[in-house]
């Protein structure tokens, strides 16, 4: 898969310092950051590539399992914490959005960490739909 020129596809916040964020399966560091544009660039590239591969075999399946429903919110110390609370870009996004009562995850402006999973899923579904409809 060839990455597009001059596009950032980092999945990590460059200012992130905590990496021992376990999943419910106890894998570390497997959570995408929905608060930075590079995550969305990466996902667009992956979906476009999947689409092009499947097109060679009589069409792309219109069902994609997004996963993510098991994003954990427990640290190894047992403290409940959403993984995105460790991402400086998400902390900044929530801080910027939470003081405006008109903001909400479904408008693309989540105001709480527990809304980021819904925000991620909704935005990813829109990207998938646009990419699938464009082929």
What are these regions (language model features)?
Residues 1-125:
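Aromatic-lined carbohydrate-binding surfaces of glycoside hydrolases
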Residues 130-135:
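Short, compositionally biased segments
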């Amino acid at each position: 898969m060839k990455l597009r020129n001059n596009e950032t596809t980092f999945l990590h916040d460059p200012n992130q310092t905590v990496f021992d964020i376990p999943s419910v399966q106890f894998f570390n560091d497997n959570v995408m950051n929905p608060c930075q544009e590079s995550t969305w660039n990466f996902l667009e590239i992956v979906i476009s590539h999947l689409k092009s591969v499947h097109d060679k075999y009589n069409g792309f399946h219109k069902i994609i399992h997004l996963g993510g429903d098991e994003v954990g919110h427990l640290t190894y110390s047992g403290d409940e914490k959403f993984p995105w609370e460790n991402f400086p870009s998400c902390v900044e996004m929530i801080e910027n959005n939470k003081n405006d009562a008109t903001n909400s995850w479904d408008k693309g402006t989540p105001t709480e960490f527990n809304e980021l999973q819904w925000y991620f899923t909704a935005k990813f579904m829109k990207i998938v739909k646009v990419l699938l409809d464009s082929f």
